[in-house]
Amino acid sequence: MEPILLTDREEYQFVTDRGFCPLLDYKRFTMDIRLRVEIQRELFGHCVFGRGNIPQANVRFFRWIWEHKPHQCEETLRPLSSYSAVYCSHILTRGSHPEMAHDPRNINILCFEMHNRWENGDREKMRIYPGNVRIIELLKNEYGSLRI
């Protein structure tokens, strides 16, 4: 089934009012990248391109992620009992891709050990690697179109 394209605020509001989360659910919904960035700025702060209060935006973003994703490590499937920003692991790092830092699709929920493995280890051997490669391609294509 093809994902549903959301092009304006009314469509976004329509699906969120019905319990869907199009910022995360990229398999069901595709959002116009400009709409996505606009909504992310409103939810988390005006720091998508390096402006604004980045630490406060990070706190809002990580809390939002924790509220909207299952509380288990995506690699080991172990439950994670309480909130910690350490569990929010960027697929593409904030330093190399600051424009994607507050895109919920760019986050895996990982326990501390798996977060370190993704950042510093042999990520190619991780269970989440193939899915993350697809997400990386999707993110780079969408955000690349913003620069045109």
Descriptions of predicted regions:
Residues 64-65, 76, 125, 139:
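Broad structural signal for hydrophobic residues in well-ordered alpha-helices, predominantly aliphatic
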Residues 12-13, 108:
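Ordered hydrophobic segments in well-structured contexts
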Residues 5, 29, 55, 87, ...:
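Intrinsic disorder/low-complexity signature
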Residues 21, 73-76, 111-114:
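Short cysteine clusters
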Residues 2-12, 18, 25-72, 99-101:
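Short, charged surface segments at domain edges that flank catalytic/cofactor-binding sites
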Residues 95-109, 113-148:
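Polybasic, low-complexity binding patches
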Residues 74-109:
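Histidine-centered nuclease catalytic patch
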Residues 3-4, 21, 137, 144:
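Intrinsic-disorder/low-complexity peptide segments enriched for small residues
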